[in-house]
A protein has these predicted regions:
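A general structural motif
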Residues: 20-21, 114-115, 143
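Short, solvent-exposed loop/turn segments at secondary-structure junctions
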Residues: 30-33, 47, 83-87, 123-127, ...
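C-terminal capping/extension of enzyme domains
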Residues: 1-18, 43-44, 91-103, 130-180
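Hydrophobic packing residues within well-ordered alpha-helices of enzyme cores
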Residues: 52, 128-129
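Short, surface-exposed acidic-centric catalytic microdomains
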Residues: 33-96
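Short, hydrophobic/glycine-enriched beta-strand segments
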Residues: 22-28
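Internal catalytic-core helix/loop-beta-alpha segment
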Residues: 73-128
C-alpha cells in the first residue's frame, strides 16, 4: 500500500489595496483556479466579481488589472487570512490545519490605518481569522468591526447571487467611504 502524499504547500497573494482603503475583504486562501491565474477570485463561477459589479459598480468584464485599479480607487482592500497552507483541493474543508501560516495582519493594519471594517467572504475566513489572527493582535486592532458575508464561492450555492448581492449591499451602506 502506497503512502498517501501530503499536498504541496500553497502560497497566497499579496494584498490588493493602498493606505486609503477603508474596507478589507478577506477570503480564506485562493483556490486552484485563482492560484493558476495569479488572480483573486479567478474561478469563472465565483460570484465575487459579479457581486462587486452589482454593489460597487466595478464591471466584472474588465480585464483583471483594470478591476484591481477600480477596487483600489473604491478604497477596498482584498486579501486572504492564510499566507500558506496545504490543501488537497480548492475546498476550505480540505485545508490541513497543522500547515496553516497566517498573513501579517498587524503589519497590514499599520500600513492601512483607515481600515474601518473587515468583511469575511464566508465563514471559513471568519473562523480562521478569529482562531489564528485575533489572539496575536494588539487590543486596538482586535476592535475593528467585522462582518461575515455570504461566500461568493461556487461551493456555497445555498443563496442566489441576488440574495448575496443584497447582503453585500448592506455592507456597503455600513462602510460609505468604500465607494467608487
Amino acid at each position: 500500500m502506497a503512502a498517501r502524499r501530503k499536498p504541496a504547500v500553497l502560497t497566497g497573494f499579496a494584498p490588493i489595496g493602498d493606505s486609503r482603503a477603508t474596507l478589507l475583504i478577506l477570503g480564506s486562501m485562493p483556490g486552484a483556479a485563482s492560484l493558476a491565474a495569479h488572480q483573486y477570485y479567478a474561478h469563472p463561477r465565483n460570484a465575487f466579481w459579479p457581486m462587486l459589479e452589482a454593489v460597487w459598480g466595478i464591471p466584472a468584464a474588465l480585464d483583471y488589472a483594470t478591476r484591481v485599479r477600480a477596487v483600489v480607487a473604491a478604497r477596498i482592500a482584498i486579501w486572504d487570512v492564510l499566507a500558506s497552507c496545504q490543501r488537497a483541493s480548492s475546498l476550505d474543508a480540505d485545508i490541513e490545519h497543522g500547515s496553516i501560516v497566517v498573513n501579517d495582519f498587524e503589519g497590514f493594519f499599520r500600513r492601512h490605518p483607515q481600515i474601518s471594517m473587515i468583511a469575511f467572504n464566508g465563514s471559513t475566513a471568519q473562523l480562521l481569522y478569529r482562531r489564528h489572527v485575533m489572539p496575536s493582535l494588539p487590543t486596538e486592532l482586535r476592535q475593528i468591526p467585522a462582518l461575515r458575508m455570504p461566500s461568493t464561492s461556487p461551493a456555497h450555492a445555498a443563496l442566489s447571487l441576488q440574495r448575496k448581492v443584497q447582503r453585500w449591499r448592506e455592507l456597503r451602506r455600513a462602510v460609505p467611504a468604500a465607494s467608487t
